[in-house]
């Protein structure tokens, strides 16, 4: 996932990962073993999957990007019978497991890396990057409305809310009004066209380490792909399919998604269902206990070797024998934004 209010001090496109981030910490928290079944819900370039397979565990690897799945076929041949690739949203990882292993099957671990794949960023035709000219697309699959659809069809107020909440863009209102005025004369269809229009509007301080369009591009991508909703549903799905003692490991890169993961594990620790405003109703048995203390970050050596790891945080939990808690998306405090399926029909 792109920058969501985390460490924006990195270079442009800093959310992109070219090498597996926190790989040693992921394996230590996940503890894969020979014969175990691990779900890699965000296959991407396959960095985590390869390392898990090397421990002797089997992997069900999920990615909604057909290009990533196709690229993974070579790894599938390298580990015959031990890697199953599934083209799917990671929010439906429970359905993917049922498809591969049978209904009701549980797994030993789930790992999620909430970062955009370098393969997607590096391909100009995918339209993720303002550093390369390409169609204003940003979809992780070929389905649904594109970023161009959002930019050219959404109301000004909705665009401003998307830029503000999903990108924490301080010029959200100004940029949205500029887009409304410009698109009436000429719709936005190319990445550099939008990036240049934003830079012309807000200017660029020579001291800034990121491009003025960074936060707008991140917000559009998160919106078009429903990345926050995907993360929320994936956490709930992982809770349903993990065996007692199974481990959920999540790597995030920015503060908004890290807060979602932190809130999930805190809620799943159980306790009273009441609050300081309402009387206690019942005690909720924990569905997860901590696998690590708080959030784990990169070592100084990894930061030196891979600056993109600088803002990475790992959180992990161990599934208890208790049943899943309430399957309620309101836990995550997701913003009310226009539905993308409505956008497609507009």
Swiss-Prot record:
Question: Which residues of the sequence carry a binding annotation for S-adenosyl-L-methionine?
Answer: 46-48, 63, 90, 113, 120
- Family annotation (Gene3D superfamilies): Putative methyltransferase TM0872, insert domain (1.10.150.170), Vaccinia Virus protein VP39 (3.40.50.150)
Q: What Pfam families does the database record attribute to this sequence? A: Methyltransf_5
Is-annotated flag, keyword Ribosomal protein? no
A cellular component annotation (GO) from this entry: cytoplasm
Q: EC annotation?
A: 2.1.1.199
Q: Please tell me where this protein is predominantly located.
A: cytoplasm
- Presence of the UniProt keyword Cytoplasm in the record: yes
The annotated region (Disordered) lies at 270-346
The record's InterPro entries line, in alphabetical order, gives:
RsmH, SAM-dep_MeTrfase_MraW_recog, SAM-dependent_MTases_sf
What does the entry give for GO biological process?
rRNA base methylation
Task: Give the UniProt keywords, A-Z.
Answer: Cytoplasm, Methyltransferase, rRNA processing, S-adenosyl-L-methionine, Transferase
Q: Write out the catalysed reaction.
A: cytidine(1402) in 16S rRNA + S-adenosyl-L-methionine = N(4)-methylcytidine(1402) in 16S rRNA + S-adenosyl-L-homocysteine + H(+)
Q: Which CDD domains match?
A: AdoMet_MTases
- From the Swiss-Prot or TrEMBL record, state where the protein is found: Cytoplasm
One GO MF annotation is: rRNA (cytosine-N4-)-methyltransferase activity
Record-stated family: Belongs to the methyltransferase superfamily. RsmH family.
What NCBIfam families does this protein map onto? 16S rRNA (cytosine(1402)-N(4))-methyltransferase RsmH
Biological function: Specifically methylates the N4 position of cytidine in position 1402 (C1402) of 16S rRNA.
Name assigned to this protein: Ribosomal RNA small subunit methyltransferase H
Q: Which gene encodes it?
A: rsmH
